[in-house]
Amino acid sequence: MTRKFLIPTENQEQRALVKWLSLHPLLKEYFYKNNNEGKRTEAQTWNLKLMGLRPGVSDLFIPYPSKTKLYAGLWLEVKRNMHYPPSARKSETWINQEIWIERMKGVGFDGHFCYGWEDGKRIIECYLSA
């Protein structure tokens, strides 16, 4: 019998990263999740857009400056820890996420895609020492 190891979902990866952040002595009070995803009716989507919903906004934001004050905060887009084919990276959603991160980098923030919660943890630890 062959055992199949499942790759955790994006939701599971983000929950694991949030759990780690919730225990972090410095950052536990300095992060939040952007509620940009989900299935909505046309009316809900329209209403949220009127309220400021923007495509591509990253999943997590840590509004805490890096050690050297080089960055004012860190934006993280959480992805599953798996290989993504080039076609997936060309989707409208992915492109909007890349645009958001580049836009934020242009105004004093840092931003990254992380592939699994452990990659997110590594990025955050590097950010804190920058």
Language-model features, listed with the residues they occupy:
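Catalytic phosphate/metal-binding cores of nucleic-acid and nucleotide-processing enzymes, i.e., regions
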Residues: 1-130
